[in-house]
């Protein structure tokens, strides 16, 4: 073991803290030896007797490379003292003491054994990258440590993260700092030409660095497309320099060639994504060219889609990239931005948990037993909006039900992939199309072998893969097809099926995509190439795409875009599949134009109508629910609210005011409209058209709401009519505010009545509207006695002139009341 690594200075402190406590944070810059030296120096600690070290690396390439370095120091190969586990690949033996794993592997191990009984120390390497799985795994490990394994040690290692902040969240865990080893770096700032692409700008600065400096060059570009374009530009110059690409999708042997010195000792250029920022050691690098950009996945809450976004690097990322130039000796870093703008860069990268799609995290939490994420201790808590959207997706995939993981959800976790892809594979297994499902899943997980210019149809990729398997000619990228076949083979092994080498139904891929992305089933939306998805969003195919003539498609890959997404990968879809597999849904609604109930059976994909048929025997309860909603919207004017019903409302309202102790229904219009279920439901069973509302007798309906004892009180205290001296029963006109009801009666019919009539047990006098024989108003009074005495004599004079055939006695108190016309006595 080499003793010139800076990490050696703090190894005693790390050993001491891990012996006395169970959690420690180590801050050490890249190149200090924390990944490749420290684990070996901890193996003899007493708490690791009979236990292993589990070290988490964020990337597969880094996991392999770290394991090889550990093995080399012991004169071994991976699988002996040190081993690794990555997706679809494992090099671990019975004597392995240090296991280097990628993040998804650790999560799976925790789910299989919550207490991690075989392990004494968990190391989180490169934690500053703040990947989603690292945050989740740390939260789960912390809970396992607190509840099941207080003896389990956790070591969090970071190059740039704020150790004090992590310490506080991890229970004030000790922070140990290694100064590292960094040679001086000269910074050269070069203006970015906005008229050129990132690849053009980067290649220009690389050529400048070749002329100005000696040594190998590491250039950072955002994505694999930028790398390929930059490589094409450099290769056209015919440089006597080896040019290597380095990104995650490349074959392992190509990646290793980029890490090692050139066999013939030639100078080399490595064009890399952010994969080379930390754990990987690339021999001979003295010059770094930083494009200033990185490409990161971002989840759009509003669209529900994840898209890759090219963003400016943060200060901590720029510093890490520059640090690669100063590991072996003094170096140079070319930055493609002005020096004055460097301090304006965002200080730190955002944790992935804040911007990622969280369905896999939520499924893991549900399987752990904590769908409520707040019950775990997080370095950065996941956003509630993203959690809600993930829960909704998992419910659509039948992975969650009523907040619990389902049998289907547990089956999804058996596949080391996103829940959508796992659901696709399960669908293929259930429908006996596992081989094609394996191919579709592999194509979705790997890079596109044809490129976007070939169009969006995934069947073209399936054909290319089939041709490649049959050793037939294909224009597709053979390296990508090889990787795709490797992944497909892993899925076929797990599903126990053979490879697909023959053509399949054109819509089969669409069925599989629809299973994984049910909300992205899409129907052409009036304009060729424009599709409306089941979730209501809109996406477009590129002009001249082979799928343009398809009415229905299922979309696997698209960019969220600003208003309309761009479709990158899709397949034709037969919507009758949904009719065959689903029972459809009964829909009952009110047709405003025709004023009638419409009942149909519909088959839908989300918001998209596939087909519908008339429903012969609709559910009456559902009809009543729709009608009640119509009443809420349209109001009481739907009904024939005649005077008799109106007066009942006013009588009840008045009595409620006069006697609040009497329990009576609330018949105010606002209350009736707000809660039609309470009074209208029993009478709506036969209503189908707007005219049917007018046929309902509101007086009878309202009367039925009043219990018999209260009805008796209503008739007694607030009668509908009262008798007058003539023997007539005269209706009262009640007011909803409880004021005096009006008794509109001809004057002659109350001759002989000395005082104003009353109701409500004599407590409420009526308001008399005294009328002429022609029912014209003569006088309004609430004091009949005063009227007879003071006003009647004058009124009599006028009435005798106007109504000469009628009798108008001088003494109204003793006069006989008259119903009809009575001949006037000459003296009267």
Model feature map: region roles:
Residues 534, 597-599, 604-828:
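Charged, non-catalytic accessory extensions
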Residues 123-124, 249-255, 427-449, 744-770:
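Charge-dense polyanion-binding interfaces
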Residues 183, 539, 729-731:
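Short, isolated positions in well-ordered beta-strands
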Residues 171, 524-527, 715-718:
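A short, compositionally biased
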Residues 233, 239-240, 245, 257, ...:
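Second RecA-like catalytic domain
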Residues 1-424, 559, 737, 748:
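P-loop NTPase motor module signature
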Residues 323, 554-574, 744-767:
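Short, solvent-exposed cationic patches
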């Amino acid at each position: 073991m080499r003793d010139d690594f800076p990490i050696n200075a703090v190894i005693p402190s790390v050993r001491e803290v891990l012996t006395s406590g169970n959690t420690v944070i180590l801050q050490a810059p890249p190149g200090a030896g924390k990944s490749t030296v420290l684990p070996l120096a901890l193996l003899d600690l007493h708490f690791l007797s009979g236990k292993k070290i589990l070290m988490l690396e964020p990337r597969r390439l880094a996991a392999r490379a770290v394991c090889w370095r550990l093995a080399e120091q012991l004169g071994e190969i991976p699988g002996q003292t040190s081993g690794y586990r990555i997706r679809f690949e494992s090099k671990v033996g019975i004597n392995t003491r240090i296991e280097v794993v990628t993040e998804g592997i650790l999560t799976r191990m925790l789910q299989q054994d919550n207490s991690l009984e075989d392990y004494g120390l968990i190391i989180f390497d490169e934690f500053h990258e703040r990947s989603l799985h690292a945050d989740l795994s740390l939260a789960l490990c912390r809970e396992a440590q607190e509840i099941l394994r207080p003896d389990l040690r956790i070591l969090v290692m970071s190059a740039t993260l704020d150790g004090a902040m992590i310490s506080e969240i991890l229970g004030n865990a000790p922070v140990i700092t290694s100064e590292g080893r960094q040679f001086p770096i000269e910074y050269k700032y070069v203006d970015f030409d906005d008229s050129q692409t990132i690849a053009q700008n980067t290649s220009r600065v690389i050529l400048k660095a070749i002329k100005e400096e000696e040594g190998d060059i590491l250039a950072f570009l955002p994505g694999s497309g930028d790398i390929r374009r930059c490589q094409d530009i450099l290769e056209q110059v015919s440089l006597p320099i080896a040019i290597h690409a380095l990104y995650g999708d490349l074959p392992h042997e190509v990646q290793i060639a980029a890490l090692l010195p050139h066999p013939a000792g030639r100078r080399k250029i490595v064009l890399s994504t952010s994969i080379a920022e930390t754990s990987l050691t690339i021999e001979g690098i003295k010059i770094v060219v930083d494009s200033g950009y990185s490409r990161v996945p971002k989840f759009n809450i509003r669209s529900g889609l994840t898209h890759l976004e090219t963003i400016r690097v943060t200060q901590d990322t720029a510093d890490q990239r520059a640090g690669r130039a100063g590991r072996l000796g003094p170096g140079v870093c070319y930055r493609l931005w002005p020096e004055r703008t460097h301090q304006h860069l965002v200080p730190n990268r955002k944790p992935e948990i804040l911007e990622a799609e969280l369905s896999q995290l939520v499924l893991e939490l549900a399987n752990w037993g904590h769908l409520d994420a707040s019950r775990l201790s997080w370095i950065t808590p996941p956003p509630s909006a993203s959690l809600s959207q993930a829960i909704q997706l998992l419910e659509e995939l039948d992975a969650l039900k009523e907040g619990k993981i389902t049998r289907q959800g547990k089956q999804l976790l058996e596949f080391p992939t996103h829940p959508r892809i796992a659901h696709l594979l399960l669908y293929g297994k259930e429908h006996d199309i596992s081989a094609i499902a394996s191919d579709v899943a592999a194509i979705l997980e790997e890079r596109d072998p044809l490129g976007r210019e070939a169009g969006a149809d995934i069947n073209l990729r399936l054909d290319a893969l089939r041709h490649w398997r049959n050793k037939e000619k294909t224009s597709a990228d053979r390296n990508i097809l090889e990787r795709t076949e490797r992944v497909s083979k892993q899925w076929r092994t797990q599903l126990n099926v053979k490879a697909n080498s023959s053509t399949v139904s054109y819509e089969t891929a669409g069925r599989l995509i629809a299973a994984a992305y049910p909300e992205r089933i899409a129907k052409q939306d009036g304009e060729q190439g424009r599709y409306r998805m089941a979730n209501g969003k809109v996406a477009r195919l590129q002009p001249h795409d082979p799928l343009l003539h398809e009415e229905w498609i299922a979309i696997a890959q698209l960019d969220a875009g600003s208003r309309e997404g761009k479709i990158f990968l899709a397949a034709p879809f037969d919507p009758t599949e949904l009719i065959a597999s689903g029972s459809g849904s009964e829909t009952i609604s009110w047709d405003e134009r025709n004023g009638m109930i419409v009942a149909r059976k519909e088959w839908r994909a989300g918001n998209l109508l596939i087909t519908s048929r008339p429903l012969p025997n609709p559910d009456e309860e559902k009809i009543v629910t729709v009608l009640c909603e119509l009443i809420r919207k349209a109001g009481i004017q739907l009904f024939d609210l005649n005077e008799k019903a109106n007066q009942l409302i006013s009588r009840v309202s008045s009595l409620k005011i006069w006697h609040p102790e009497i329990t009576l229904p609330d018949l105010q219009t606002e209350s009736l409209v707000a809660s039609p279920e309470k009074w209208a439901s029993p009478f709506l069973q036969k209503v189908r058209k707007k005219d049917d509302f007018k046929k309902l007798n509101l007086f009878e309906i309202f009367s039925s709401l009043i219990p018999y004892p209260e009805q008796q009180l209503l008739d007694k205290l607030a009668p509908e009519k009262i008798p007058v001296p003539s023997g007539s029963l005269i209706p009262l006109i009640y007011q909803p505010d409880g004021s005096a009801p009006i008794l509109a009666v001809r004057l002659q019919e109350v001759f002989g009545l000395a005082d104003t009539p009353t109701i409500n047990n004599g407590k409420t006098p009526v308001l008399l509207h005294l009328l002429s024989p022609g029912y014209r108003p003569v006088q309004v009074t609430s004091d009949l006695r005063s009227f007879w005495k003071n006003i009647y004599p004058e009124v009599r004079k006028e009435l005798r002139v106007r109504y000469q055939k009628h009798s108008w006695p001088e003494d109204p108190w003793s006069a006989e009341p008259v119903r009809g016309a009575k001949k006037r006595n000459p003296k009267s």
